[in-house]
Structures are given as structure tokens and as C-alpha cells.
Swiss-Prot record:
Disulfide bonds: none annotated. It is a multi-pass membrane protein. This is Dendritic cell-specific transmembrane protein. It is found in: Cell membrane; Endoplasmic reticulum membrane; Endoplasmic reticulum-Golgi intermediate compartment membrane; Endosome. Expressed in macrophages and bone marrow dendritic cells (BM-DC). Weakly expressed in the spleen and lymph node. Highly expressed in multi-nuclear osteoclasts compared to mono-nuclear macrophages. Expressed in foreign body giant cells (FBGCs). Isoform 1 and isoform 2 are expressed in osteoclasts. Disruption phenotype: Mice show a lack of osteoclast and foreign body giant cells multi-nuclear formation and a bone-resorbing efficiency reduction. Mice show increased bone mass. Older (>12 months) mice suffered from multisystemic inflammations in the kidney, lung and salivary gland. Mice show autoimmune symptoms, like dendritic cells (DC) with increased phagocytotic activity and antigen presentation. Several domains are necessary for interacting with OS9. The region in the cytoplasmic tail that is necessary for interaction with OS9, is also required for its transport. GO terms for biological process: cellular response to interleukin-4; cellular response to macrophage colony-stimulating factor stimulus; cellular response to tumor necrosis factor; membrane fusion; myeloid dendritic cell differentiation; negative regulation of cell growth; osteoclast differentiation; osteoclast fusion. Glycosylated. PANTHER family: DENDRITIC CELL-SPECIFIC TRANSMEMBRANE PROTEIN. Induction: Up-regulated by IL4/interleukin-4, macrophage colony-stimulating factor (M-CSF), receptor activator of NF-KB ligand (RANKL), lipopolysaccharide (LPS) and toll-like receptor (TLR). Up-regulated by TNFSF11-induced osteoclast differentiation in combination with TNF-alpha. Down-regulated upon dendritic cell (DC) maturation. It comes from Mus musculus (Mouse). Its main location: membrane. InterPro entries: CSR-E3_Ligase_Protein, DC_STAMP-like.
């Protein structure tokens, strides 16, 4: 408990030093400068971590840090702006940045894996065609050559001029197979298809990389613009009306002060007011905040559907190729018979028979698919968990933005408190008229108005009971 109290007191002291320097003394100025330099260091570190792909050199980062320190020390609006920008990272702007990161993870994971499996399937088909072209042509032609040579060996040479001429005859059989042309055609086709796939993969990676960087820059620009608009509305001519639905501790003190001075007060709030106004700090959501929470999660659900769709396509392709592997491995071999039929003395028969086996699919050409679920959905789960936490804490972050703003501008805070107090009193002054108008409607809701017989029966039951008591 003492440690918590000590930490709270140190934080409040540093917060007060950051918001308003106490005095122009050197000690207070050094404390103020140290706190501003620390906040600037955290901001620059956060920026460099978010945009690591354009990480500038250390000298440039040091220059940016020094410039940020000077701005924070000299400008109250700059100190408020940088804190509001950090808090805005947890609202819609941070949501958009996380969605962009999740989309990049899906494209780099599932889409690239889909192209990889398609390429493996294409390589398997071309490998099997090449292997079958050799395993079918050459055994068949070899048996055909053996059959021709066997026929040639059965032929009886003519010996009409053995005494005059002698010669030796040999049979040379040369084979011509179109397998080389087929292989060249398959290589050309495979090169064209792989070129198209490579072009698609490179284009997808390039578009993803550029799109992710552009979305990150757009997210940073959106954070800065939205923070600037927030400050403009908060400090504008009608700033006391902007997001003025929070009951702060200063509002409670103001209401107690009004009560001590015998003036109208508004606390505690009634049931209807508690649905609209939020007592800070509070985790209870108003109907407006619930609607905002639903709008916060709507893009998340849309992109989640797209991510699941890509994952389903990747998984179905993986299952399809895996089932094809099992079917290819279970296919029986094909036995080919080469029979040479001849006719001798009017009788036909098989004079030569040879057989060889051909496998339907080469085992070395079976595709091996890849599934990258763990590599993709582990970071996606972290991103989704972060989005859920940010969505649930979005109302709390908005409260923090209001509290930070009023800490830097107490004059605006007093105007907001007075306006909200007067607004609540004005609404309560109109409530009696509404309640008077609402009494007949409440009377119409009673059962005995529509069924007076029930009221008469109840009276008859209560009269004898009263007589017994007498």
C-alpha cells in the first residue's frame, strides 16, 4: 500500500511538472525539461517502432528528439497535443493501423502459401509427364526392337550364289522418339506458367508492401489530423458543448459548493441521466458509447471475414492436394503386354510375348503441400486480442482524452462544468410537467382500470377481514 501511495505521489508530481511548471526557478525548470525530454524520447521511440521500414539514421532521430523537446518545453498546446495523439492510437486510428497490419500478415502468409502450393502442383504435373514420357516410350520401343530382331533371327538366308559371292548381312534398328520435343514443349509451358505465377507473387508482395506503408502513413496522418480537430473543437467558441457528458471530480466539487451555498444542485443523477452521462472514471457504457463500440468493431468483423476466407481457401487447397497425394500413392501399376502374332500353315498364334509394368504416378513427383496456419494466425490472434482490448477500453481512452485536455486548460474546464450544471438544471426544471402529463398513461396501465370486477372482488374480500378484527 505504501509503495502504491509513493508511486501515485511521484506520478502526480511529475504530471504537475509536465502540465504547469511551478515557478521559474532553475530546479523546477530542470525538472520540467527532464520530463519533457522523457516524453519526447517515448514519442520518438514509438514513432520509430511503428515505422521501422523507414527508420532514419541515429543523427536524424536525435535531431527530431531535440526539436520535440524544445517544442514540449515551450508550448503547452504541444504537450497536450502529443499526449492526445498517443491516446488516439488506441481509438479508431490505432484500430485502422492494426487492421492494416493484419491484412499484411494474411497476404504474406496465406496468399503466398496458395501460390506456393499451386507451383508445387504444377511442378508435380510436369515432373510426372516427363517421367511417363520416358517410362512409356523407351520400354515399349525396346520391346519392339527386340521383336524385330527376333523376327530377323528366324529368317532363313538365301544361299543361291555361295560359291561366287559371299556377304554378311546385319540388321540395324534406330529409334526415333518425340520425347525430346515433348520435353522442350513442357519446359516452355512450365516456364510460362511459372513466370506468370512469379509475376503474380511479386506484384502481390509489392502491392502489399506499398499498401501497408501507405496505410501506416495514412494512419499517422489521420491520428495527427483527428487530434488537431479534437483540440480545435475542444478549445473552439463552443468547446463547452463538445463531448460534455462526463461527470468529473471537479464537477462534483462544484455541485457540493452549490449545495453549501443553498443553490440548486444536480447530484446524485437520476436513472435517466445515468444512462446519458458518465461519472469519471467508469467502465459502464452509455447507449451512445455502446453504439460507438459497435461501430468500432464493425470494420474488424468485416476484415476478419476476409481473413477467414483467405485461410479457408488456403486450407481447402492444402486438403485437396493432400487427398490427391493419397490417391496417387494408392493407384495400382499398369501392366503392358506386347504380343507378336504370326500365321504358320494357316494357324494364327502368339509367337512372341513380353510385358513390363508402368506406374501411374511417379513417387518422386508427388506434390508436397504446405500449410502456414501457425505462422499466420499466431500474430493475427495477437492483433485480434489487441483490437478487442482497445475496443473495450475505447470509452476509457475517450475519458482520458477529456481529462488530459481539461488538465491543460482549467478555464475551459470551468466553462464546461458550468454549462453542464446549467443544462442538467434546465432539464430537471421541465421534468414535473412531463411527469404530470405522464400520470394518465400510468393510470391506463393499471389492471383494475380495464377489469373493474377484479377491484370489486378484492374489496369484498377485505371487508369481512376487517369485521373479524373488530
Amino acid at each position: 500500500m505504501r509503495l502504491w501511495t509513493l508511486g501515485t505521489s511521484i506520478f502526480l508530481r511529475l504530471w504537475g511538472t509536465y502540465v504547469f511548471p511551478r515557478s521559474p526557478s532553475w530546479l523546477d525548470f530542470i525538472q520540467h525539461l527532464g520530463v519533457c525530454c522523457f516524453v519526447a524520447f517515448l514519442s520518438v521511440s514509438l514513432f520509430s517502432a511503428a515505422f521501422y521500414w523507414i527508420l532514419p539514421p541515429v543523427a536524424l532521430l536525435s535531431s527530431v528528439w531535440m526539436i520535440t523537446c524544445v517544442f514540449l518545453c515551450c508550448s503547452k498546446r504541444a504537450r497536450c497535443f502529443i499526449l492526445l495523439a498517443v491516446l488516439s492510437c488506441g481509438l479508431r486510428e490505432g484500430r485502422n493501423a492494426l487492421i492494416a497490419a493484419g491484412t499484411g500478415v494474411v497476404i504474406f502468409g496465406h496468399v503466398e502459401n496458395i501460390f506456393y502450393n499451386f507451383r508445387g502442383l504444377l511442378d508435380s504435373m510436369t515432373c510426372n509427364l516427363r517421367a511417363k514420357s520416358f517410362s512409356v516410350h523407351f520400354p515399349l520401343l525396346k520391346r519392339y526392337t527386340e521383336a524385330i530382331q527376333w523376327i530377323y533371327g528366324l529368317a532363313t538366308p538365301l544361299n543361291l550364289f555361295d560359291d561366287l559371292v559371299s556377304w554378311n548381312q546385319t540388321l540395324v534398328v534406330s529409334l526415333f522418339s518425340p520425347s525430346h520435343a515433348l520435353e522442350a514443349h513442357m519446359n516452355d509451358t512450365r516456364g510460362e506458367v511459372l513466370g506468370v505465377l512469379h509475376h503474380m507473387v511479386v506484384t502481390t508482395e509489392l502491392l502489399t508492401s506499398v499498401g501497408q506503408k501507405l496505410l501506416a502513413l495514412a494512419g499517422l496522418l489521420l491520428i495527427l489530423v483527428s487530434t488537431g480537430l479534437f483540440l480545435k473543437r475542444f478549445l473552439g467558441p463552443c468547446g463547452w458543448k463538445y463531448e460534455n457528458v462526463y461527470i468529473t471530480k471537479q464537477f462534483v466539487r462544484f455541485d457540493e459548493k452549490e449545495r453549501h451555498q443553498q443553490r440548486p444542485c444536480v447530484l446524485p443523477l437520476n436513472k435517466k441521466e445515468r444512462k446519458k452521462y458518465v461519472i469519471v472514471p467508469s467502465l459502464q457504457l452509455t447507449p451512445k458509447e455502446k453504439k460507438t463500440l459497435g461501430l468500432f468493431f464493425l470494420p474488424v468483423l468485416t476484415y476478419l471475414y476476409m481473413w477467414v476466407l483467405f485461410a479457408a481457401v488456403d486450407y481447402l487447397l492444402y486438403r485437396l492436394i493432400s487427398s490427391m497425394n493419397k490417391q496417387f500413392q494408392s493407384l495400382p501399376g499398369l501392366e503392358v503386354h506386347l504380343k507378336l502374332r504370326g500365321e504358320k500353315q494357316g494357324t494364327q498364334g502368339v509367337v512372341h510375348d513380353s510385358a513390363f509394368n508402368i506406374s501411374m504416378f511417379e513417387p518422386s513427383c508427388i506434390p508436397k503441400p504446405r500449410l502456414s496456419v501457425s505462422e499466420t494466425w499466431v500474430p493475427l490472434s495477437i492483433i485480434l486480442l489487441t483490437l478487442i482490448i482497445l475496443g473495450l477500453l475505447s470509452s476509457m481512452l475517450m475519458q482520458l482524452k477529456i481529462l488530459v485536455s481539461v488538465s491543460f486548460y482549467p478555464k475551459v474546464e470551468r466553462e464546461r462544468i458550468e454549462y453542464l450544471h446549467a443544462k442538467l438544471l434546465e432539464k430537471r426544471s421541465k421534468q414535473p410537467l412531463r411527469e404530470a402529463d405522464g400520470k394518465p398513461s400510468l393510470y391506463f396501465k393499471k389492471i383494475h382500470f380495464w377489469f373493474p370486477v377484479l377491484k370489486m372482488i378484492r374489496k369484498k374480500q377485505t371487508i369481512p377481514a376487517n369485521e373479524d378484527d373488530l
